[in-house]
């Protein structure tokens, strides 16, 4: 870890202990480049991947990749460094296109599907590129982004509770609102995928497992040796989210799948 990273981490630790959260956030913003706001927005919108506000992709409509792309474009010089450092990762779209050519020659190419597949791969690259720039090159202090991430997932859980209450108390204005907000809605009776299921802000209820075990759980393991406070906060979030999802009958099969015998 270079001296800049150590300095930023020391500042962030000072902000974390004994200061009001809003002052820590303002101090963080004043010590970073303006482009960091795109990174923070991308992190904040990670749990929002199924609304009509996002970019359409097969089976989901995320917002964060576009925000991470804006962050990468604002830091294009650092993006070149990250691309050179992680060249195999950035050659992934080229490799996928080459591997797809035999199938296109034999069965034909569907331009719309090919376009969405390529943009999906680019979304992966800008997300990983944003992380590489922020953590590996700019050495942005990690506590503030992590606080935002935890808060955004708690917010999405709260949205799920509101959806559950709206469904079970038959609050039609709320169910209609969420039905219009979600790209593939599972909320009300007009859903072609079956109504009466909350989905938080995810594309579908089964995505709960992806977020819990693909985003939050790895972060918790990374935090165990770095900051016990944040590891505990992430653990509490995962436990409450998983138990809450099961009790509200959303994504139960996905949450419990690892513990269920094959039928």
Regions inferred by a protein language model and the residue ranges of each:
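Juxtamembrane membrane-water interface segments that cap and precede transmembrane helices
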Residues: 43-51, 184-201
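Interfacial loop-to-transmembrane-helix boundary motif in multi-pass membrane proteins
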Residues: 32-35, 88-93, 131-176
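Membrane-embedded alpha-helical segments of multi-pass membrane proteins
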Residues: 56-75, 118-129, 208-216, 254-262
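N-terminal membrane topogenic signal
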Residues: 17-39
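Alpha-helical transmembrane segments of multi-pass inner-membrane proteins
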Residues: 146-173, 192-194, 200-249, 253-262
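Membrane-interface helix-loop-helix junctions at transmembrane boundaries of multi-pass membrane enzymes
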Residues: 27-32, 73-90, 222-236
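N-terminal hydrophobic segments of proteins, predominantly signal-anchor/transmembrane helices
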Residues: 35-50, 65-130
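Structural signal for the C-terminal ends of transmembrane alpha-helices
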Residues: 48, 69-81, 130-142, 219-227, ...
